[in-house]
Amino acid sequence: MIIHFTLNGAPQELTVNPGENVQKLLFNMGMHSVRNSDDGFGFAGSDAIIFNGNIVNASLLVAAQLEKADIRTAESLGKWNELSLVQQAMVDVGVVQSGYNDPAAALIITDLLDRIAAPTREEIDDALSGLFSRDAGWQQYYQVIELAVARKNNPQATIDIAPTFRDDLEVIGKHYPKTDAAKMVQAKPCYVEDRVTADACVIKMLRSPHAHALITHLDVSKAEALPGVVHVITHLNCPDIYYTPGGQSAPEPSPLDRRMFGKKMRHVGDRVAAVVAESEEIALEALKLIDVEYEVLKPVMSIDEAMAEDAPVVHDEPVVYVAGAPDTLEDDNSHAAQRGEHMIINFPIGSRPRKNIAASIHGHIGDMDKGFADADVIIERTYNSTQAQQCPTETHICFTRMDGDRLVIHASTQVPWHLRRQVARLVGMKQHKVHVIKERVGGGFGSKQDILLEEVCAWATCVTGRPVLFRYTREEEFIANTSRHVAKVTVKLGAKKDGRLTAVKMDFRANTGPYGNHSLTVPCNGPALSLPLYPCDNVDFQVTTYYSNICPNGAYQGYGAPKGNFAITMALAELAEQLQIDQLEIIERNRVHEGQELKILGAIGEGKAPTSVPSAASCALEEILRQGREMIQWSSPKPQNGDWHIGRGVAIIMQKSGIPDIDQANCMIKLESDGTFIVHSGGADIGTGLDTVVTKLAAEVLHCPPQDVHVISGDTDHALFDKGAYASSGTCFSGNAARLAAENLREKILFHGAQMLGEPVADVQLATPGVVRGKKGEVSFGDIAHKGETGTGFGSLVGTGSYITPDFAFPYGANFAEVAVNTRTGEIRLDKFYALLDCGTPVNPELALGQIYGATLRAIGHSMSEEIIYDAEGHPLTRDLRSYGAPKIGDIPRDFRAVLVPSDDKVGPFGAKSISEIGVNGAAPAIATAIHDACGIWLREWHFTPEKILTALEKI
């Protein structure tokens, strides 16, 4: 069929299949703003176009409908080197993070302002209701529209976007646009899917329909015979190597319990066979031709089921220890299933697979018996949480190709260096023959720390020599991605009558699902990032992680902290009620203070025993709680309005800024001959603005404009090693490495500048904009670099920095919530939510606020509406965004505020600490305690639903 239509003002004539999907058609025409986030359901809005004057999801159209149509995409909004009014406002406000659906947002907002000059909040919400944004938190979009409206009348107009910090510094703590925001909002090619070549093969995966089963027969011959099928990978022809999908520093503190393909299926969606074909259509047809038979086994679905004496064993294969094998290993292995498979454990992590225990750890300080004996009151409560999904707008994706004898991996990953190490080992190549290019990442939130499809894609290319694309569908994100661990946490508190704690005990049990990636470290962070908030002389913790047959779990922003913090905050609030003490008052009586030793952290390691006891070197909780109390009007009356009851709640929170004594970051900075700089950073910017942090840190040290600094990051051929984007390590680790590299280069510039000026080094200094200034005059960075590169020069000037540390930098914060609960219907309305956070010196204030809003809204979603649900046989019923319940713009609190409260930390660069993760840690307990304040019930399992409200009120 030949169709005629207008695209961004230009007439088009195309020969198409009448039923061809318009999103795919436009993307293949180079309209990279029209992206697919939700398998064509039109829920996410990443595929928004203007179709005959109306905003429409391109995925919901077929090619035949384009006949005589007028189509506009986000590519029409500005020129290639010039942003439109709305695009510029988005960049200036700092709303662009991962950027994947920001072109669609720009198009929708532009259309709104073309129709309505000054839209109301309700009109804004309606216009953006079809867009799914997982990272920005929506609140800043109101600022975008406010700024765009103001600039329509006055192009120079400004609004208050974010406060500034540190008057003693030039660029740190000041507004500066995110360095990659412009190309993202313009939809310039920067994601993995934008790099795929026309000759690329496609992988489609046949997945297990059973939660627990053995493959008894597998025949792929018919699939292999289908024209266009290039290769089929199964357990019969994949590498016989065991690994963990968790992208962590070696030796990994997780069981190496995964083979690329195995004989045993451990969850619905587990890998059976991968078809590599010339097209997606051929690959999908080939999947139907694979003949497979299973012996279905009873699944293990919960922590309690995994603990049962007669529980099926999820990992029944023999275990091999690299070091520290237990005395019982030989006996345990004598009872193992002999299928030619095994598991490897690098060092003792408390794993007992025959008992379905993937990992465990115990520790304590003080005398627990004495602590509880000294208590006037003792309470013990158990709290449960469900499985939640990260839902990045860009699903997992990888594109691999050969470049001569080298394997090139274009990846949407948080850990390019760990990915290279793992893939090289699996495909049998040396690391220097594997080149990982971290493209822009359309959202990760922890899930892209795990290596979930890259190794299959790489192996397919190595076997066939062909370029290969492997991209998850949204359904695969739910059944084959890693989600947040299910947890069951029991807290026992002893306290005096005044509420001061005498003993704290936490039993943290986690459900890791079918594989043990992060099975030690995520649950360890439950107590590690909650117990230190309330220092006590007598503390005991037990962490036990169980295998099961639910869909996989792994890294998710917060990394165990939300579960532990919910339990300790709720238990303390229940203690306060029993003692008739105000919740905020009991927090004040027990909370951590600046400079205080965090003794319990001397007993909790993250894959390694602690070497010292850290302290809260910087902590702004006193000011945070003062401001929060005032903002929420904590003690003011809460009038009842019919069935609606008002309540207020609070939770304090903390996080780390990297993993001391385990992780490392490196950086190199090169002075160019015109006085500009190129930074080669190993860090992985996944939308958090790390490249902008590195830019500003280098500019601050080198006294040059930030625009004179260009950052190359996350590319294993063009940067130095960095552990990657996890553990909130970007600013402190990658940032400090950049600071050290800049300081190293600064000394070289000063030395050679002094020589050129004929002055002692002690008499010269760097000065903005990019000069060495002495008593006799000054010389530009460009002149110094040029002299170095002449035939008689001293060579190129390069600075390097390597950062390791034994020290912690802890960000702190508090969440305040006000809810209205309808005691007749059970409806919960979140009217106010305030997130106040101490991230030290905010390097990029507007980006920091965006990080807080996004993380906090994800936490609100986990608390109010999100859950992966299963049937009794282990089939996940939640397989798309429509049924999952992640919040959109209409779901945010009416009064939603993020506040930066600074402190000065000695570990982070220029006093900075992390910001991206801590925001997810406190919403659930703040909301739950507000619900209790409203109607007197304790919800000990989250998320919170009207049904749970009415059940607790004994109305159903």
Placement of each model-derived feature along the sequence:
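Helix-loop-helix junctions that connect adjacent transmembrane helices in secondary transporters/permeases
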Residues: 318-427, 593-676, 696, 804, ...
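Glycine-rich loop/linker segments at domain edges
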Residues: 94, 174, 180-186, 247-251, ...
